[in-house]
Amino acid sequence: IENEGSNPAGKGKDTNKEFILYSVYDQKTRPASIDLTQTLWKLTPSRKLIDMFVCTDGLPIDKSPKFQGYQKRGDEFKNRDYRLKSYIGTPDANTKLTGGNAGYTPYKFTLYGRNTTNKDEYSNYPVLRLAEVYLNYAEAVYERYGEITNEQLNKSINKLRGRAGVASLTNELVTENGLDMLTEIRRERTVELYMEGFRYDDLKRWGKLEEELNESRCGMV
């Protein structure tokens, strides 16, 4: 987010109203300790994460007729949740990404057009943001009552899905397509909070850590 051409609304970290608590980084008082575009090999996303992003109709890729498959490079990014292109580098990304060993590279928290080796990348890092509050609420409601109403989904998870250009998560969508509501709530948490340090502890909380970490790790097709 650098200029009027790429950011006509002038949005940036100084106008961010979503972060409730956050760590501030800038070139003078607190430079970043790593280069996001160069050294995040340990955060390289696998195809499993990529496949977790739903299509614009709100359905997982194995359920959605909108999924374009893997025939050509970039096909899998079409008709998908906007967060996929925001978080993962695409073949036409404006920021050149060189880290990664699975064919995918992390794009989240990078700056538009930057590709530096001098740590000149200064996005603030969230400690607590509004999206996490929404996700905590939806998960807590479902875990407590074994169900969640569409109204409760609309004031939590669907605020995130709407921003990402994805159809709302509803009880009807789940029932009509043979989905599981808890799985979809957890999916939303996983994709929204990618690279924010939650996944490992979430898997432990859900009793899924051993199962998930022992699966094969695949890269780009």
Which residue ranges define each predicted feature?
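Acidic/polar-rich alpha-helix caps and helix-coil junctions
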Residues: 1-34, 65-221
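Active-site-adjacent substrate-recognition loops and nearby beta-strands
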Residues: 34-40
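Short, cationic low-complexity segments
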Residues: 40-59
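Short, electropositive, low-hydrophobicity segments enriched in small/polar residues
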Residues: 62
